Amino acid sequence: ESWFKDANIYARMGYSIGGTAPLDMPATIRKLNSYSPRTNLMYGVEFYKPFHNRWGLATGLYIENKGMKTDATVKNYHMEITRGGETLEGLFTGNVDTNVKQWMWTLPILATYELGSQFRLKFGPYGSLITSKNFTGAAYDGYLRKGNPTGDKVLLGHEEGQRGTYDFSKDMRNIQWGIKVGCDYHFTKHWGATAEISWGTAGIFKRDFHTIEQTMYPIYGTIGLAYKLK
């Protein structure tokens, strides 16, 4: 009981913006035409325990969603698509749109450091259990070379029946992990503002998935509010 005497509990909520992307933009992606974040929200409860010399521990449980929509121009981009019931694999040149959406439970374990009575730094690992996942899109306004750069040429148009669609949702991981870095600023006795960056250190796809050749990492920033319950 004495160990919990000086511990605090916070209710937290936030809004996240970011995306799922490779660390380096590959040469096969020539241009990002558009990017639209989804309504990415985070809710949860945080447990904070101070220790000695300004150090402490923060953990908790959060439910959150992360998603985005992008459209890019690509050249010789490896794809596996479906059109008219036929599955086609090869190198695509044209436009690709992508929709990503995930719901998850997240457990962080963060070291904290106090800078005065109001400002707190936080950093450490997190793990997320994915409860809902979606990675879908279409290839359009271009052509696909079957198998290799000199393979048969398949034209893909703009209209729905002329596009090639893909759905890699089942190839996504059920568990993700990474690093969080953030800070809290407590501007009243009970209320505080929060900001953090979460960087997935493992890609969102399973290890045996190779259709997208680059490793895709979830990278998001979150701003929000915290309310001190105890």
Where are these regions (language model features)?
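Short glycine/proline- and aromatic-enriched beta-strand/turn motifs that initiate or cap beta-hairpins
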Residues: 1-48, 172, 200, 228-230
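Outer-membrane beta-barrel channels and translocator barrels
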Residues: 4, 50-52, 116, 188-190, ...
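Hydrophobic, lipid-facing positions within transmembrane beta-strands of outer-membrane proteins
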Residues: 7-9, 39-45, 105-109, 177-181, ...
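Membrane-embedded beta-strand positions of outer-membrane beta-barrel proteins
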Residues: 9-13, 59-61, 109, 123, ...
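Extracellular/periplasm-exposed beta-strand and loop segments of Gram-negative cell-envelope proteins
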Residues: 19-38, 66-102, 130-176, 203-220
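Repeated loop/turn-to-beta-strand initiation elements of outer-membrane beta-barrel proteins
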Residues: 54-57, 118-121, 189-195
